[in-house]
Each structure stands twice: as C-alpha cells, then as structure tokens.
C-alpha cells in the first residue's frame, strides 16, 4: 500500500534512491538560500533608494573605476562630495551596494555605534590578517573590547613621557643625514622615504627597546615591514589576486609569506627573551629595573597586562598587538609629517611663524630638545599640523559593516548588512562643513573658530569607540619632529606639484619631494 501511495505521488523513484533524496534536499536548501538572498537584496535595494547615487559607468561594473587611487580619482571624489554633501550610494558590480558617508551628522550614527553593531569590514582589512593577526585593528566583538581595555594603559601619559627622548634621538639621526646631504647648500629629499625610516626607528625602540640603526644601515626587519605594506597596497588593485590560493602562487604572494615569517620571528624572539627575563627577576624587580631606565616599552606593558579576571595576553596576542602597532604607527605618522612639511614649504609665512614659536620656546635651553611639557606650548604649530591633517588625512577612508539597521537623524535607515565607507577625506573636503575646503588655513583651528564646529568634522584619527588608540603618541611624535625640523632647516617646495595617491595611507606618486636648507 505504501509503495502504491509513493508511486501515485510520483516519489517512489526518489524513495528508492537515497542519492536522489539527498540531491532533492540539497537542491531545496540551495533554492531556499537563493530565494532568501534575492529577497534580502531587493529589500535592501528598496530601502537604499532614499540615498542618492551618481550615474553608473554601466549596469555590470556599476561605479567601479569612477574614483581611482590617483590624483584624478581624488578630484572626482571632491566633486562627488560637493554634489552629494550628505553622502551617496555606489555599486561595486551589479549586486554590491556601498554607502559613502561624508557629513558629520550622518557619520555620527555609524561611527559612534558600538563595535558589535558597526565592526570594521573584513573585506577592506583581510589582506593584513596573515601579518597582523587578531590585533586591535582586525579583531571584533568581545576580544576587541577586552584587548582595548588592556592596552589603554600602554598609552597613558606616564608611559608616553619617556618616549620623548627616543623621538628626539631619532629625529637627530635623520637631521644629521640631511646636514650631510645638504652640505652644498640644499638637498632635494623624498620626505616619505626619510620620515618612514625615522618613525620605524622610533617605533622599534618604543615597542621592543631595540636599536637596529635602520636610519644608518639596512635592516632586514625594517625592510620586511616596508615590503609588506607595499605588497598589501598592490594586492588591493589586482582583483583576481584577492583569492588567497591564487595570490600565494605568485611571486608577490611568496614574498609576502617570507616577509611575514621574518617579522613574526623577530617579534616572537623578543617576546620569548622578555618572558625568560620576567620570571627570573619577578614582576616587582622587573618594574624597578625598568624604572631606573625610565622607559617601559610596549612589550613590557603587554606582558604585564591583565584583564578584570586576572588573565594575561597569550604570546600570539602580544605578537599581534606589537605587529599592529609597528604597522599603524609608521606609515600614518610619516604621511602626516610629509604633508604638513609640504604645506609649510608652500606657505613660508606660516613656516616662519612656527619657527619663531619653537625658537622662543627653546631660546635658553641646551641641548635643543622638545620635552613633554613643551607640547602644550606650540599652539600655532599644532594648528598648522591639524589643518594639514584635514587636507591630507593619512587614512582617507574607514569601512564599517553594519550588523543591524541604523536609523539616521533625518529618518533614513541604513539596512543591516550594508558596508559603509566613512570618507575621512570627503568629510574634511566637504564645502557644507568647511568653507573654501581646498584652501590651507591653519586659523580654522584657532580655539575661537572650533567652538561651533561638530567634533566629527575633523576625524584624522577616526572617532567613537574604535578611534585610534595611539593618537596621543602620534601627535607627540609629530610635534617633536616638526618643531626640531623647522628649528634646523628651511623647507622649500620642489618644482613639481605632488600627485596624491591613496593606498593604505595617503601618499604621493613617486614620493613627496621637498628641498631642505640648513639654517646654521
């Protein structure tokens, strides 16, 4: 009877073959997922209609190639921001919508959302994972929250103050090179090249208490970090190589793996050596020895950190955080310093005023070094730095993946699952936020002029719960380098105007070349 019923229903052949039944279940599962995805896609499209979009290049590619990582692309972005000052929708292919946000009122809802609601988008950061691991830059959820709480003491003023001596020493080494190169009166130098080495030199001393003399001779470790940064930037623009399997078959992929191994081996060796030292001395003796040298480096802080339950970081976690700090701390600071020197070269009247401010501060002091308490007494230099960071933010865009609907102040809704690009560059160049946004005007940051401005109008270090944990470190280093550079050198523009090139940080095509003249 059961056979007759199955036959009458047309299911007897299926019941007779478990493989056909399995195929039917699989096809049903696939169809259900396709239908669910299709419904979600069309629902998102409907809800995103309230966001304006520029004309697509074509139906398949969408807006891909409209804003290229070139000077021309930056100009297109500037025009888009002027046309759509609240932000706009773009399509990366036929089925991938993104929202580009460039106004403080709109950004606020996303950037101030918790790390669970608006985590960093993995697509834009995933290529860094084999190098940086699950550190603060790439981690999410409870792990990110725990590590953020544990690492915050590493950037307390009392930890940062002793680093001032390191900053002074590293910039002195760079300036000694410049004096030799400019022995005949002046020298034309690529600021990115020289300042990147200087920031890496400082970071190695602050993170590992290790002096590689990388500004004076080649260093394998430093060369590996520079190579990794270049390879990650290059991979972003090669769509097929986004697939890991294909990438690691290429010469670039193999170079990336070798450089990762070298960097990881160096960090692991320092951690293991420090772990051997710590038990033999005990925590109290270890801290007393460090107090005599007046410097507690980043590895020390990580090794001693405990969470609320008394748990420490694993060696893998410490390596990830140290490698992340080395990556995030060198390129961003080098970019910020290079562009502010460019602006001061273009505006000699501001350069001279900064120089006089530094000379007045250090007039009765030998040696001429910048100390922690000096940082608050360089107001005009700080204004010049901030205006440069506005025009040329080191990190031009931040991505967030929205995990639940976010309601904007004007009532529009960003649907769950959408990637939001918080355009730092766009916000800083938005004429609805900044009058004459392309003009370099340090007085925008005069204390009287910032009172009525949204705090999210200026976000070079991001904002909200996932803002840059190292921004005080970065600003301190930048002030030391800029003050001593202007004290010793006159900076002049090169004959060719730099062309902006956004990669992992905002660079200049072929380097950012300026002429330096020793003042004495």
Curated annotation (Swiss-Prot):
Its EC number is 1.14.14.1, 1.14.14.79, 1.14.14.94, 1.14.14.78. Inhibited by dietary sesamin. One of its GO terms (biological process) is renal water homeostasis. It catalyses: an organic molecule + reduced [NADPH--hemoprotein reductase] + O2 = an alcohol + oxidized [NADPH--hemoprotein reductase] + H2O + H(+); (5Z,8Z,11Z,14Z)-eicosatetraenoate + reduced [NADPH--hemoprotein reductase] + O2 = 20-hydroxy-(5Z,8Z,11Z,14Z)-eicosatetraenoate + oxidized [NADPH--hemoprotein reductase] + H2O + H(+); (5Z,8Z,11Z)-eicosatrienoate + reduced [NADPH--hemoprotein reductase] + O2 = 20-hydroxy-(5Z,8Z,11Z)-eicosatrienoate + oxidized [NADPH--hemoprotein reductase] + H2O + H(+); (5Z,8Z,11Z,14Z,17Z)-eicosapentaenoate + reduced [NADPH--hemoprotein reductase] + O2 = 20-hydroxy-(5Z,8Z,11Z,14Z,17Z)-eicosapentaenoate + oxidized [NADPH--hemoprotein reductase] + H2O + H(+). Liver. Also present in kidney: specifically expressed in the S2 and S3 segments of proximal tubules in cortex and outer medulla. Transmembrane segments: none annotated. CDD domains: CYP4F. Heme binds at residues 328, 468. Pfam families: p450. One of its GO terms (molecular function) is 20-aldehyde-leukotriene B4 20-monooxygenase activity. Keywords: Endoplasmic reticulum, Fatty acid metabolism, Heme, Iron, Lipid metabolism, Membrane, Metal-binding, Microsome, Monooxygenase, Oxidoreductase. Its cofactor is heme. One of its GO terms (cellular component) is endoplasmic reticulum membrane. Pathway: Lipid metabolism; arachidonate metabolism; Lipid metabolism; leukotriene B4 degradation; Cofactor degradation; phylloquinone degradation. A cytochrome P450 monooxygenase involved in the metabolism of various endogenous substrates, including fatty acids, eicosanoids and vitamins. Mechanistically, uses molecular oxygen inserting one oxygen atom into a substrate, and reducing the second into a water molecule, with two electrons provided by NADPH via cytochrome P450 reductase (CPR; NADPH-ferrihemoprotein reductase). Catalyzes predominantly the oxidation of the terminal carbon (omega-oxidation) of long- and very long-chain fatty acids. Displays high omega-hydroxylase activity toward polyunsaturated fatty acids (PUFAs). It is linked to Coumarin resistance: A condition characterized by partial or complete resistance to warfarin or other 4-hydroxycoumarin derivatives. These drugs are used as anti-coagulants for the prevention of thromboembolic diseases in subjects with deep vein thrombosis, atrial fibrillation, or mechanical heart valve replacement. Belongs to the cytochrome P450 family. This is Cytochrome P450 4F2. It comes from Homo sapiens. The lineage of its organism: Eukaryota, Metazoa, Chordata, Craniata, Vertebrata.
């Amino acid at each position: 009877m059961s056979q007759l019923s199955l036959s009458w229903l047309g299911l007897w052949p299926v019941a007779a073959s478990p493989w056909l039944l399995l195929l039917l279940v699989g096809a049903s599962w696939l169809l259900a997922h396709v239908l669910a995805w299709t419904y979600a896609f069309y629902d998102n499209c409907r809800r995103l209609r309230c966001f304006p979009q520029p004309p697509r290049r074509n139906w398949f590619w969408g807006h891909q190639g409209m804003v290229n990582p070139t000077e021309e692309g930056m100009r297109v972005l500037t025009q888009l921001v002027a046309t759509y000052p609240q932000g706009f929708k773009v399509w990366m292919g036929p089925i991938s919508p993104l929202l580009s946000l460039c106004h403080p009122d709109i950004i606020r809802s996303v950037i101030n959302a918790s790390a669970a609601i608006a985590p960093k988008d993995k697509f834009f950061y995933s290529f860094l994972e084999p190098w940086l691991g699950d550190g603060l830059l790439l981690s999410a959820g409870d792990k990110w929250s725990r590590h953020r709480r544990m690492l915050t003491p590493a950037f307390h003023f009392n930890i940062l103050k002793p680093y001032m001596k390191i900053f002074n020493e590293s910039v002195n080494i760079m300036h000694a090179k410049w004096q030799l190169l400019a022995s005949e009166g002046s020298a034309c130098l690529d600021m990115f090249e020289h300042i990147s080495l200087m920031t890496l030199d400082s970071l190695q001393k602050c993170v590992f208490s290790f002096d590689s003399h990388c500004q004076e001779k080649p260093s394998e470790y430093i060369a590996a970090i520079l190579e990794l940064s270049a390879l990650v930037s290059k991979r972003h623009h090669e769509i097929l190589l986004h697939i890991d399997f294909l990438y690691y078959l290429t010469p670039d992929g193999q170079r990336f793996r070798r450089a990762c191994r070298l960097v990881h081996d160096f960090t692991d060796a320092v951690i293991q050596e420090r772990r051997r030292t710590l038990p033999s001395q005990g925590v109290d003796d270890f801290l007393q020895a460090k107090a005599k040298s007046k410097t507690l480096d980043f590895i020390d802080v990580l090794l001693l950190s405990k969470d609320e339950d008394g748990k420490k970081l694993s060696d893998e976690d410490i390596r990830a955080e140290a490698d992340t700090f080395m990556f995030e701390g060198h390129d961003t600071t080098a970019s910020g310093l290079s562009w502010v020197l460019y602006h001061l070269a273009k505006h000699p009247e501001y350069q001279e005023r900064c120089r006089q401010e530094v000379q007045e501060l250090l007039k009765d002091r030998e040696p001429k070094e910048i100390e922690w308490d000096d940082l608050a007494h360089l107001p005009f230099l700080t204004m010049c730095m901030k205006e440069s960071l506005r025009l040329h933010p080191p990190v031009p865009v931040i991505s967030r993946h929205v995990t639940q609907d976010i309601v904007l102040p004007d009532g529009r809704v960003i649907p769950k699952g959408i990637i939001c690009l918080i355009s730092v560059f766009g916000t800083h160049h938005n004429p609805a936020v900044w009058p004459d946004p392309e003009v370099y005007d340090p007085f925008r940051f005069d204390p009287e002029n910032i009172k009525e401005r949204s705090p999210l109008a200026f976000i070079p270090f991001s904002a909200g719960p996932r803002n840059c944990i190292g921004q005080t470190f970065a600003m301190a280093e930048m002030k030391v380098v800029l003050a001593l550079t202007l004290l010793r050198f006159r900076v002049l523009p090169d004959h060719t105007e730099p062309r902006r090139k956004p990669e992992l940080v905002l660079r200049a095509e072929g380097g950012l070349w300026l002429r330096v003249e020793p003042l004495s």
